[in-house]
Regions:
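Domain-level signal for soluble alpha/beta catalytic cores
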Residues: 1-370
Length: 370
């Protein structure tokens, strides 16, 4: 199993030339082959950046995706109303005055309207390219299956999927097939991103799910069973499980600690590494870590991707030592609270800020664990 003491969630800031090329491709001004050349070059560069920073775990920065969760609808037919706001909707908040709050409406036509038909893999090609360009641990991120629960609509989806459970069964099957293929290709570390669980600490988001007929306890139980069905499809593979509170354009969705969800999630999910958000007071304290089973590692997301603030090795080590009062030091790691760019709309920091933060994580891990 992967035991690295330095990790980052996955997404990295897209360089301006890649974003410009994506826009030109969408406008029909750039041939797909030329875009692929630019995209491949950007991925090679971001791999080199992580290696130079000392990262033992590397990703492709999610550079080939519109959003961390967009590959399901990009690779599988059957959805309608999908645009960038499908991944950005919600009431977003910021602690920085110049960023401010923002509300993005859910696309009104967003729904599954046909039976799912897989056209290509979600991440197998990403992994193959990544593995061929690094000798570090190559990590692939995938969305938790129940992130897509909101795409089932009792009216618009009923012809394709009269029952919600039937839709979710197909989503789970797609993701199970994907992790099996990743495992076959040699992937040793995959991560499920599950930001929808911490949303349940917020009354408004609880009401959203309860309006669909689920109590919080029922929803957590259902979701964890779905996650475990995906994780259990690839025995021997290390799985990370990332839990944050929303991260987009340096904004967040909810505030509060993990207290209300820690027992069912930390103890119930079959993941080997829990990547948790702990970069500010909004994230709550370390007390819920006492509920982490002894066979799991915790990646403390102490380094923020939302602001340029330069964390120091001293402060990070102090917080790691504090967490070690609840979880054995050897089962801890240090990382980011979330990605640097969970969609093509990245956080409001510079590429230099990103590099410095990755270097600080690697140096801190070396200082604490050797």
């Amino acid at each position: 199993m992967v035991s690295a003491h330095a990790d980052h969630v996955g997404s990295l800031l897209r360089p301006p030339e890649l974003l410009a090329a994506r826009d030109r491709l969408a406008a029909g001004e750039l041939a797909p082959a030329e875009f692929k050349r630019i995209e491949d070059a950007a991925v090679r560069d971001v791999i080199a950046l992580q290696e130079a920073a000392g990262c033992p775990v590397v990703t492709d920065g999610e550079f080939r995706r519109e959003s961390f969760q967009s590959e399901l609808t990009a690779a599988v037919d059957g959805f309608a109303g999908v645009d960038i706001d499908a991944w950005l909707w919600g009431e977003w908040h910021s602690d920085v005055a110049e960023v401010g709050d923002r509300t993005t409406e859910r696309p009104p036509g967003l729904a599954v309207v046909e039976r799912l038909r897989k056209r290509r893999s979600l991440a197998a090609e990403e992994f193959t390219f990544l593995r061929s360009h690094t000798d570090r641990i190559a990590k692939i991120t995938l969305p938790s299956p129940t992130l897509f629960a909101n795409l089932w609509d009792p009216e618009r989806s009923r012809d394709a999927y009269p029952r919600f459970d039937d839709f979710m069964a197909d989503v789970i099957d797609v993701l199970r097939d994907e992790v099996r293929e990743l495992h076959r290709l040699g992937c040793t570390y995959a991560q499920l991103d599950a930001p929808h669980y911490p949303l349940l600490i917020d009354p408004q988001w609880r009401a959203f799910y309860e309006a669909r007929g689920w109590s919080v306890d029922e929803w957590l139980r259902y979701g964890i069973e779905a996650d475990n069905a995906v994780i259990d499809a690839a025995p021997g593979m290390t799985f990370g499980f990332h839990l944050c509170r929303g991260n987009q354009d340096s904004r967040w969705l909810v505030a509060g600690g993990y207290d209300e969800i820690a027992r069912p999630v930390f103890g119930g999910v079959h993941a080997h590494r829990l990547l948790l958000e702990y970069d500010d007071e909004r994230s709550g304290g370390f007390d819920p870590l006492s509920l982490v089973p002894d066979d799991r590692m915790v990646v403390l997301g102490l380094v923020t991707t939302k602001t340029p603030r330069a964390e120091t090795e001293d402060e990070l080590e102090a917080r790691i030592r504090s967490a070690a009062e609840l979880v054995d030091l050897e089962r801890l790691a240090v990382g980011t609270q979330c990605g640097f760019s969970t969609s093509v709309v990245g956080n409001r920091i510079s590429l230099d800020d990103e590099r410095r933060k990755l270097e600080t994580i690697a140096r801190t891990a070396e200082r604490v664990w050797g």
